[in-house]
Amino acid sequence: MAEKRHTRDSEAQRLPDSFKDSPSKGLGPCGWILVAFSFLFTVITFPISIWMCIKIIKEYERAIIFRLGRILQGGAKGPGLFFILPCTDSFIKVDMRTISFDIPPQEILTKDSVTISVDGVVYYRVQNATLAVANITNADSATRLLAQTTLRNVLGTKNLSQILSDREEIAHNMQSTLDDATDAWGIKVERVEIKDVKLPVQLQRAMAAEAEASREARAKVIAAEGEMNASRALKEASMVITESPAALQLRYLQTLTTIAAEKNSTIVFPLPIDMLQGIIGAKHSHLG
C-alpha cells in the first residue's frame, strides 16, 4: 500500500498544474449539477446502478478516470476494483507491461562516408499512465518514430569501425537518449539493441580481400621466422660437430639408422680406419 501511494504521489507531482487541481475547482456550477444528478441517479437506481459503477482492471493495467472531461485528482487507479459515476465519468485503460518493437532497417551515412543499413529492437514500458494519456496522442507510435530518428542521428556521428566494434556502447547511448526524450510522455525505455549492420557488397568484398591479404602476410612472417630459427639451430649444431669428431660419427650412425628404418634394408659399412688401427695395436702389444 505504501508503495502504491508513493507511485500516485510521484505521478501527481509530475502532472501539469491543470491536472493537479481538484475536479471541484474546474467543474463549475453546471458540472456540479450534473455530478449531483448522476449521484442521485446512482442512489435511486441502486442496486441496479452498482453494476454501472463498479469497474475492475487487471494487475498489469491502470485506469485514468475523466469526470466531465477532466482527469480526476489522484492519478491512475488500479489494479483491482474502482468506482465511477454513470453519465459523467469515463476511463481509459493503460497497459503497463513491457512492449518491444523492431526498428525498420535504416539507410545511414556514417562519419567516414559509408552507406550502411542498420536495424534494431527497443524495449519500453509505460511508467506514468497519466502522462502517457494526457501528454501524447499515441505514445507507442511516437516512441517508434523517435527510435528511428535517434538511430540515424547517433550512428551518423560514428565511423564504420566504431559501429562494428562498439555496438553495445552505441545501443546504451541510444537507450539514454530515448529515455530522456520520452520521459515527458511517461515512457521508460528499458533497453535498445542493434540487431544487424549490413554493408554494401563491394565493401564486403574489399574487406574480405584485405583480411585474406593480412592472413597471407602473417603466414609468410611466421614461415620466415621458422626458417630463421632453423638456420640458427643448424649453425649451432655444425659448430658443435666441428669441435667434436665423435659427435660427427654419432650423427653419421644416427643418419644410417634413420635411412635403414625408412627403406627397410640392411646397410653394411666398414669400420673406421682409426678404430682398426687401435684394435691391431692392442693385439700386437698383447702378443709381445
Curated annotation (Swiss-Prot):
Residues 267-269 are annotated as: Required for lipid raft association. Keywords: Cell membrane, Cytoplasm, Cytoplasmic vesicle, Cytoskeleton, Lipoprotein, Membrane, Palmitate, Phosphoprotein. Residues 265-273 are annotated as: Required for homooligomerization. This is Stomatin. The modification Phosphoserine is found at residues 10, 18, 161, 244. The lineage of its organism: Eukaryota, Metazoa, Chordata, Craniata, Vertebrata. It comes from Homo sapiens (Human). Changing residue 276 to A: Reduced oligomerization and lipid raft association. GO terms for cellular component: azurophil granule membrane; blood microparticle; cytoskeleton; cytosol; endoplasmic reticulum; extracellular exosome; extracellular space; intracellular membrane-bounded organelle. The keyword Lipoprotein applies.
